[in-house]
């Protein structure tokens, strides 16, 4: 399954399972995959609404992560493939951990 997002002057079709994480930086959202990095003006909430709710979550207000690419979770951060570390907000920690546990149990 893919999502369509407006990237620069064209529509990009991105495979959902290839998305590692999405970052909100300044006035754009950056979608990271293994092969490529995409930039879009869509909001994080708009992007989150296109993604499977059980597979994606926000560890803090500026990021969305794909549970398929989480390698570990500490009290303060989420570690993804390629040793990418994203801070885990204290007020989101419990919900994030519960949702991740539910996801890996299937």
Which residues fall in each region the model found?
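Conserved binding/recognition cores within well-folded domains
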Residues: 1-87
């Amino acid at each position: 399954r893919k999502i369509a997002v407006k990237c620069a002057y064209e529509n990009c079709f991105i495979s959902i399972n290839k998305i590692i994480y999405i970052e909100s930086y300044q006035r754009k959202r950056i979608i990271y995959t293994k092969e490529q990095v995409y930039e879009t003006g869509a909001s994080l909430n708009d992007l989150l609404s296109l993604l499977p709710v059980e597979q994606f979550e926000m560890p803090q207000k500026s990021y969305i992560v794909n549970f398929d690419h989480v390698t570990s979770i500490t009290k303060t951060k989420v570690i993804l493939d390629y040793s990418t570390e994203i801070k885990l907000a204290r007020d989101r920690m419990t919900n994030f951990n519960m949702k991740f546990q539910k996801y890996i149990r299937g």
